[in-house]
């Protein structure tokens, strides 16, 4: 939908994936690296201690990665087109431009700080994306509001469930006012 389109364009979606990877796989933030892959053929890669790499490849379509995630460890028959390596002549990778796409850098900052900071960035992002879709904020202005919320909402190192609920509410109020 519209929100995921904006999150992808601003690279906040990648930022959320970095935060998710830390929790899903129990890795340190410095073990998670984002690379831009313009062909969108490689959906994920893991490099192991011995330097070998396992990658999940497919057409630029999220049906296969989602099917794989839901059916693992089983493999289901795919009813959609398959990747043909004969037509896949080039795979390129680039470093993300975190100066231009500040949301990815903000997500890494939230991950490094921990505590309730990922909650703050999530709540602020939901508000600014809605504001952008309703023509109340510019595309680049979204990052400014998220960053201000990260600076102004009280940081809690070891939040309780109640702290998360309060943080979410306060951040949404603040983001709407900025």
Language-model features: locations:
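Catalytic, metal-anchored helix/loop core of enzyme active sites in primary metabolism
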Residues: 1-178
């Amino acid at each position: 939908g519209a929100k995921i389109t904006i999150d992808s364009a601003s690279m906040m979606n990648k930022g959320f994936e970095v935060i998710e990877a830390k929790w899903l796989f129990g890795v340190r933030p410095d073990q998670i690296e984002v690379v831009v892959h313009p062909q969108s053929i490689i959906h994920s890669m893991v490099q192991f201690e011995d330097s070998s790499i396992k990658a999940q490849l497919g057409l630029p379509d999220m049906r296969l990665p989602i099917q794989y995630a839901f059916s693992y460890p089983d493999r289901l028959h795919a009813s959609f087109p398959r990747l043909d390596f004969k037509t896949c002549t080039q795979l390129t990778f680039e470093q993300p431009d975190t100066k231009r796409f500040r949301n990815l850098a903000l997500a890494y900052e939230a991950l490094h700080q921990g505590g309730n900071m990922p909650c703050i960035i999530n709540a602020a992002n939901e508000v600014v994306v809605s504001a952008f879709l309703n023509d109340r904020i510019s595309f680049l202005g979204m990052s400014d509001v998220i960053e201000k919320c990260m600076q102004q909402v009280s940081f809690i190192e070891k939040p309780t469930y109640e702290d998360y609920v309060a943080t979410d509410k306060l951040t949404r109020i603040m983001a709407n006012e900025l």
